[in-house]
């Protein structure tokens, strides 16, 4: 069975964590977008929500379905340089950080 992928060719950089942002990114990926999830080395905190299997919760697996991922330390110059390069090449940038 084939289905339409209206967002095919759209590149998304996803720095969101938790529930809403990763879910949005998963929907974009399901509609064909190339979503790159950027996480800290310890992973998104949603990895511990609910029942876990290895390093992932069921929500973490579902919320990151169809995404590629990279772990970066945004407190380092190198980590910021890499994420800035990804953002420069992206069509969409998602984040869910608190203000400030």
Language-model regions, residue ranges each:
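N-terminal helix-loop segment corresponding to the beta1-alpha1 unit
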Residues: 1-100
């Amino acid at each position: 069975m084939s289905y339409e992928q209206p967002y095919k060719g759209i590149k998304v950089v996803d720095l969101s964590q938790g529930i809403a942002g990763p879910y949005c990114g998963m929907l974009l990926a399901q509609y064909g977008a190339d979503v790159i999830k950027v996480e800290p080395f310890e992973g998104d905190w949603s990895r511990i929500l609910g029942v876990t299997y290895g390093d992932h919760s069921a929500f973490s697996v579902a919320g990151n379905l169809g995404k590629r991922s990279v772990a970066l330390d945004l407190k380092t110059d190198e980590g910021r340089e890499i994420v800035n390069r990804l953002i420069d090449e992206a069509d969409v940038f998602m984040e869910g950080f608190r203000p400030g």
